[in-house]
Every structure is written in C-alpha cells, then in structure tokens.
C-alpha cells in the first residue's frame, strides 16, 4: 500500500515513479471537481444573450474542445512527470519561463483571493451575518492552507475521492434539476437571444477549461499512466463544465453575489453550504500551483512556507478588494496564458514530436531564452486584447468572433512557422 501521509518536497523535479500512482478515476474526480464552481454559473449566464440552440451547441463544443486542450497540457506533465511551468522551458527557455511563472503566481493569488471572497460572502449571507465577513476569510483561508500543506496526493485521495466530490455531485444535480423544473427552462428555451453570436458564446465556454491549463501538469505529473490521466481529465472536466454552464444559462444571473442569493433560496441554503465545501478545492489548486510556479524561480524555498504566505496574502486581499473589480483584473491576466499554451502545446506535440529530455528541461541543453516563443506569444496576446471586450484596447468594430480561439491559433501557427523556418535554415547551413 502506498503511503500518502507526508507529501514529498521535490518541488519542480520529476516526480519519482513510486509517487506516481494516481489512476484515471482519481483524475476524473479531481478535474470534475475543479469544473464545479460559482464562477462557472456566472460565465454560463452570459449565454442568455444567445439563441438557445446556439448556446447549447457552444456549451457542448466549447466544453469538449477546451477540455481536450486541458488534457493535452496535463499529458505533458504525465509523460515527463514535470509541473506546468517547467513544461514551458523547451520553448521559452529557462530564463524566458520566469515571466510566465511570475504572471502565473499573480493570477493564482488572484484566483485564491477570489475563491476566498465568494466562499466568505456566501457563508456570511447563509448565516445572516452572525459571523463577520473578515472572520470567515480567516477561517476559510486557514482551511485552504491546510489543504495546500497536505498536498495534492492527500487532497485527491482522501478529501475529494472519499468525501467532497460526491456531495458536490449530488448538490449540483439537485440544483440543475430544480432550475429545469421550475419554469426557468421554458423561458430560456423560447428565448430568441439578444445579439451574442455562436462564436462569441463558444469563446465564453472554452475560456473556462483553458483557464486551468497553466495548472494541469502540476497535478497530472502524479499519474500512473498518461493514457488514463488524459481520459479522466478530459471526461471529468467536460461533464461538469457542460452541467454548470447549462445551469448558469438557466439561472441567468451573472453577478456572483446574485448567484449566491439565487442558490441560497433553494432548500433553505443547504445546497449552497454543500457546494461551498467543494469550492475550497479550487482555492487549494490555485495556491498549490502558485507555490510550484514560484519554485521554478527559486527551488530552495519550502512549499509549506510559500503556501502559508500566499494564503495569508489572499486573505488580506479578500478583505480589501471588491469582487467585481478584481474579477476583471484576473481575467485579463489569465488571458495571457491562452496564447502562451498555444506555443507550448504546439512545441511539444508538433515541433518536438512529444520528445522532451531531462537535459532540455533542467540541464545543459536547456535554452536560456526562446525568442521565437516569446514573439509568437506576444502576437497572440496582442490579438487577444484587441478582440476581448474586457480589454482597454478592444476594437469594437471588428467582427465578434471571440478572443480565446483566435489568439490560441495565431500564436501556435506563428511559433510553428518560425521553428520550421529556423530548422530549414539550420539544415541549409549544414549542407
């Protein structure tokens, strides 16, 4: 029997084979759990502006396509037993990967703050402000830190697998069934939409699984086999993403506090309380991955020190920043990783043909700075911000085709083109 009581502290090094024992069902549990969240309800509500058939098609195709990319990113981790930011080194270089690491820490501290905010707000509303909001942030933050220190193996096997995910499934299904049988569904079904195109809807849906890509390998590196981890990741996230986007479509409330109020009215708030139990694992995943990303810059810092420090910072931020303002900020930072992983995935699966060696990741053959990757990434980021309505440089006169898919594709194609050109130049010189 494998012991998982004391999480090892190898940090960014390849995971030893004796600790790579998570199965496909474990990844189904993990990623289906991470697909559950109040934020997904919020995102789903934006689809009420589309025709019903367009919204449903966007939910299905966006969830399948986005989850496939998520599973591909996780497979780099399970193939090589490495965390996410290390997987950027063969394309961006050791020093070039520092910028993605810093940005990832920023966005993950942001998401941890956001999760603590909404869990604390929900708990405060549920108990009628019997316990002040700031006390809830401390209590919930402490619990998140405990999960982080316990580590992913313990959280997946003992917390999610044995307890949290199952009550989350039950409460989620009850909420969806309630929404579908109370007259809300018929209103959505008959809606003619208010101008959101299919492609804009697809962009809204695919953005959620893609937002988890910078974290995927941090957890999938513990897989016993890549094939089962890929299946568990893909199926698990696809199912819950479809379920919660459809729930958000029926709920029709985009404001997170409004969603909390709406769910609170179902079964006297009991289901909201259960849902909050599962929401904690999202915060755990954020704070743990922030720690691993930091260790790619300085591997000597102990994980538990970083986890506690990032959680304290998130608690302080959650007491001093409004939910609405902060959500837009972290969404804009998170958008940077869409074209970044367009580069990383194309490098691993197309340019390098799924062959990363330890020397490319850690040793003397590792790049210092990958200029083609940085150039392709920069072009993708610029395109994203030109196409995103959240961006200060958004061009409203351009066609509403969304920002996620175009920026991902353009960064991938540019990188592949530059690398193929570089390889041809090398061969010509050699000849």
What are these regions (language model features)?
Residues 14, 343-417, 421-431:
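C-terminal membrane-solvent junction of multi-pass transporters and transport-like membrane proteins
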Residues 120, 135-179, 192-193, 233-237, ...:
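Membrane-interface loop-to-helix entry segments
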Residues 24-40, 176-183, 190-251, 262-284, ...:
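Hydrophobic, membrane-embedded alpha-helices of multi-pass small-molecule transporters
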Residues 45-75, 96-98, 238, 406:
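Extracellular loop-to-transmembrane helix junctions
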Residues 97-130, 280-296:
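Hydrophobic transmembrane alpha-helices that form the core helical bundles
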Residues 100-105, 116, 127-152, 166-176, ...:
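Transmembrane alpha-helical segments of multi-pass small-molecule transport proteins
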Residues 45-49, 75, 118-128, 141-163, ...:
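Membrane-water interface regions at transmembrane-helix termini and the short interhelical loops
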């Amino acid at each position: 029997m494998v012991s998982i009581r004391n999480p090892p502290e190898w940090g960014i090094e390849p995971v030893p084979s004796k600790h790579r024992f998570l199965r496909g069902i474990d990844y189904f549990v993990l990623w289906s759990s991470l697909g559950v969240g109040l934020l997904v309800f919020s995102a789903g509500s934006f689809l009420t502006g589309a025709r019903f058939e367009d919204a449903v098609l966007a939910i299905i195709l966006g969830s399948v396509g986005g989850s496939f990319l998520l599973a591909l990113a996780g497979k780099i981790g399970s193939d090589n037993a490495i965390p996410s930011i290390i997987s950027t080194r063969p394309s961006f270089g050791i020093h070039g990967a520092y910028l993605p690491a810093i940005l990832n820490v920023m966005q993950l501290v942001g998401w941890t703050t956001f999760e603590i905010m909404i869990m604390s707000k929900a708990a405060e509303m549920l108990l009628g402000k019997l316990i002040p909001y700031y006390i809830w942030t401390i209590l919930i933050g402490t619990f998140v830190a405990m999960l982080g220190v316990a580590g992913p193996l313990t959280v997946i096997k003992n917390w999610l697998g044995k307890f949290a995910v199952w009550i989350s499934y039950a409460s989620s299904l009850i909420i969806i069934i309630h929404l579908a049988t109370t007259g809300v569904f018929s209103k959505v079904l008959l809606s003619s939409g208010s101008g959101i195109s299919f492609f804009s809807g697809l962009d809204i849906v695919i953005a959620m699984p893609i937002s988890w890509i910078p974290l995927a390998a941090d957890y999938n590196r513990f897989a016993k086999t890549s094939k089962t981890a890929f299946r568990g990741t893909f199926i698990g996230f696809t199912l819950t993403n479809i379920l919660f986007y459809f729930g958000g479509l029926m709920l029709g409330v985009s404001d997170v506090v409004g969603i909390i109020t709406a769910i609170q009215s179902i079964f006297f708030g009991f289901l909201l309380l259960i849902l909050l139990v599962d929401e904690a694992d999202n915060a755990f995943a954020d704070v743990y991955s922030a720690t691993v990303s930091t260790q790619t810059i300085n591997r000597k810092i102990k994980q538990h020190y970083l986890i506690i420090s990032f959680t304290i910072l998130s608690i302080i931020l959650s007491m001093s920043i409004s939910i609405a303002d902060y959500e837009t900020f972290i969404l804009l930072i998170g958008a940077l990783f869409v074209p970044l992983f367009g580069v990383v995935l194309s490098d691993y699966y197309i340019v390098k043909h799924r062959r990363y060696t330890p020397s490319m990741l850690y040793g003397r053959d590792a790049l210092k700075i990958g200029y083609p990757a940085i150039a392709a990434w920069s072009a993708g980021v610029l395109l994203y911000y030109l196409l995103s309505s959240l961006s200060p440089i958004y061009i409203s006169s351009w066609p509403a085709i969304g920002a996620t898919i175009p920026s991902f594709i353009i960064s991938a194609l540019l990188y592949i083109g530059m690398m193929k050109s570089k390889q041809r130049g090398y061969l010509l010189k050699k000849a």
